[in-house]
A protein has these predicted regions:
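Alpha-helical scaffold/interaction cores of sigma-54-like transcription cofactors
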Residues: 1-460
Length: 460
């Protein structure tokens, strides 16, 4: 009251606003965008006439072999989580169409008839996708990847992360890596015991990424597609410099204070209070006879960690069933790639999944642009039309380059440390490269010498 004695309405207005605030949850079940399924395959109305709620109850609460796996209470909870019977008709329609596309793709890849191993893998994965409520997600991803390849002439990466463990993704053309051949685990990607939205990172060539985003925006509608905001916060040194500038503290003194902050503090989180406790010179500055110095540290401690500015997530894009503004607050920003105005969610990435909005990751990869340019140069100068996905992975001359460590420009194989280990490993198979790529990470890196010794029989 004393602080705001001259403007008492500031307090009364604040209390009035507080009284009007109502609690509500932003959490929501996944809001899956609607994928346009050909009417000659089926419609929701047709499925309502064809299937009863009992049919859906059985299909969504039994395993892929028709065995009951949920008690009645758990089954009802699952159906409620998926959106009730009204939503189940849509999910079943999408799941059936997804199964058709997956089996059609499998027959093109593996031949017809399919082996029992392939059929069992596809049936299992499709069951998980359906009963988790995500078939529409895979239909959308395969659609824009197919458009990138066949309509837009954009290069698409062969696969990244856990999605490469899905045989359905492989048969749909989302990935180009056979998870059955390489014994990759589907459960790392989708697991009914760990309910979370699927997350497929898709690589496009740098120049083509904007074209794909434009295609997606045109297909689903500008009001239904948005990028994701990022919030930049004040780090310790930046907080000191920002406050010092407002305080009109001399630049030399501002730099001196900022440089006193260590890069890390043993066994403690790096923040200004801990830095002051750790550095005697900062303690002296906090007790300085100069009020500008004292106030700089005082206000920097208050502001440290607060939001300083906003940006746009490098690759995350939301595709919504409805207008984005029906679900989250948005702003606009200029899209650097398309030059057009774009919607940007005001919830950051860590919150978006809780709202039920579906995030797709569109990554621009310079390596793909280089490969695309190289293929075009081969066509122009040699008259050869190369399909990069059909080049043999058993070419001796290529392995010779890896053995010599000549991998500059090769994605994830170009660092000096990787080149050193490649020269020691002398890889001769694709599996050797897989192992080296998996091992060259902070956790297992110490085991690389043992792996190399065992390859060459120097260790049992």
């Amino acid at each position: 009251n004393e602080l705001f004695a001259d403007v008492p309405e500031a307090l009364s207005n604040t209390l009035e606003i507080l009284d009007k605030v109502e609690y509500y949850s932003i959490d929501h079940a996944p809001i899956m965008p609607t994928f346009a399924i050909p009417e000659d395959f089926g419609t929701e109305e047709g499925y309502r006439q064809k299937y009863t709620e009992k049919d859906l109850f059985d299909e969504f609460t039994q395993d892929e072999n028709g065995k009951v796996v949920l008690d009645e209470e758990a089954a009802k909870a699952k159906i409620k989580r998926l959106g009730g019977y009204e939503k189940l008709y849509r999910i079943k329609l999408e799941a059936d169409y997804l199964a058709k596309l997956a089996f059609d793709g499998a027959k093109r890849i593996y031949g017809d008839p399919l082996s029992d191993e392939v059929k069992e893998r596809l049936v299992f994965e499709l069951y998980i996708m359906k009963t988790m409520g995500f078939p529409g997600y895979f239909l959308i991803v395969q659609d824009f990847i197919n458009a990138a390849r066949t309509q837009l002439g954009v290069s698409v990466g062969p696969g990244r992360g856990s999605a490469a463990g899905s045989a359905v993704a492989y048969c749909l053309g989302i990935t180009k890596i056979d998870p059955i051949q390489y014994d990759l685990l589907f459960e790392r990607f989708l697991n009914p015991d760990r309910i979370s939205l699927p997350d497929i990172d898709v690589d496009f060539d740098d120049d083509g990424r904007g074209e794909v985003l434009r295609w997606v925006t045109e297909k689903y509608g500008q009001e239904k597609v948005a990028h994701i905001i990022t919030y930049g916060t004040m780090a310790t040194k930046l907080a000191i410099k920002d406050v010092a500038r407002v305080q009109k503290l001399p630049l030399s003194e501002s730099d001196r204070l900022a440089k006193l902050v260590p890069d890390k503090i043993p066994d403690k989180k790096l923040n200004l209070p801990n830095a002051i406790a750790y550095v005697p010179e900062l303690q002296a500055a906090e007790a300085s006879p100069d009020p500008l110095v004292r106030d700089t540290l005082k206000y920097a401690k208050m502001l440290e960690g607060n939001v300083r500015g906003t940006g746009v997530h490098a690759c995350g894009t939301i595709i919504c069933r409805d207008d984005i503004t029906d679900w989250v607050p948005v702003s606009t920003a200029d899209d650097k790639e398309t030059g057009e105005k774009m919607l940007v969610t005001q919830y950051e990435g860590s919150v978006i999944e809780d709202t039920g909005l579906i995030k797709m990751d569109f990554l621009g990869l310079k390596t793909l642009s280089i490969i695309k340019e190289a293929v075009e140069n081969v066509r122009l100068h040699r008259g050869l039309a190369l399909d990069i996905d059909k080049i043999s992975i058993n070419d001796p001359a290529t392995y010779k380059l890896y053995c010599d460590g000549r991998t500059i420009g090769t994605f994830q194989f170009e660092s000096a440390g990787m080149q050193k280990y490649l020269r020691e490993l002398q890889p001769g198979t694709f599996e050797d490269l897989i192992a080296m790529n998996a091992l060259y990470r902070p956790g297992p890196m110490d085991y690389i010498p043992d792996f190399i010794d065992r390859k060459w029989g120097r260790k049992p």
